[in-house]
Amino acid sequence: ELVLNDRLIRIDKNDSMNVWYWRDWLIKTPKWVKKKISLRLDENTGYKSYRFGLNKKNYILARVVYKAHNPDWDITDSSQNNQIDHININSLDNRIENLRVLTSQHNKWNTSAKGYYKCNFTNKWRAEIRVNGKCIKIGRFTEEADARQAYLNAKEIHHKVPA
């Protein structure tokens, strides 16, 4: 159970598998007003998230799930030092073991395929990484997988995300 805006919210889940069933998931207030959760897509970034409204305020489900398991965490603080990160990069996987609080910069480092691209001029794959605002060139590769691996190796060195 969780209290938001002086309203009690009951979070139902399948405890045996610890899997949230989003399509059938309902937020229930003390008056048992059912609130549906909607899937939102940010067309600028492609970021998908589950959201719902309560008392004329919108909530991102990942933040609510994290708050339910961490009562002392401030759900209203959306500053750069208080971002919810999905460890496995799937923004729709809101299991508590997949959520952590990071700074905005650390959160941006945990993204899917980036750091390599196909160079039209050389017809090779180029890998590069940004560190403290500077672009470091890693190299050119004939195979995409090699460029990706080189980027991931550099990412492990330069982008150490705190546990």
What spans do the regions from the language model cover?
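Short, solvent-exposed cationic patches
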Residues: 47-54, 58, 155-161
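A short, exposed loop/beta-hairpin motif centered on an aromatic-Gly-Thr core
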Residues: 134-144
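A short, charged, amphipathic alpha-helix used as a generic interaction element across diverse proteins
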Residues: 142-158
